[in-house]
Amino acid sequence: IIGVPGDDFIENFLDHTDLNEVRLAKEFIKFNERCFVRLLGDMRAYNYVVEMTPDFEQNQYRVRAIDFDQQSYEGRRSFYLPQFFKNNLPVVNLCTRLINPETSSQYQREERTLIKRRFNFSPTRIKKLRSCMCEDRISSDEKVRRLSNELGNLHKDSRFLKCETMGDISFLN
């Protein structure tokens, strides 16, 4: 796996003078959104890596998940947002210090737009994936109900209340 484990990055790289804090904060906000959209949970710092790519005088950063066993399983919305895990707090603090809420929302919209573009590029594959995910019962009915209620309230969308599987919720989210 290419990249520095998130917990090592936080401990050993976050205070480097050559760290481009704004780029890292922007990428973490986008990573947070990718996890939420995909319902990829348990993104504690040891479950992702940070790739650093030299780009002229600065580095580019890309945060990538490396543990997928908690995808579309839990019933709590916060479980799918890396910002709520204690060991990610130093990066979350960096984000809140450098990026205002409006800009953060813009990055989230940008990430959702990119995901939508990828979806539209492969409609046949997405249709097959959706069919498989919506038929599979990977979580308990109680967790499906709880998450559909939380996301319905968050998005102000009653369609979530009709979801019967985590696959249904994932594709609506």
Question: Where does each model-flagged region fall?
Answer:
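C-terminal catalytic region of ATP-dependent kinase domains
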Residues: 56-173
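Conserved kinase catalytic-core segment
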Residues: 8-79
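Short pocket-lining segment of the protein kinase catalytic domain that shapes the ATP-binding cleft
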Residues: 1-7
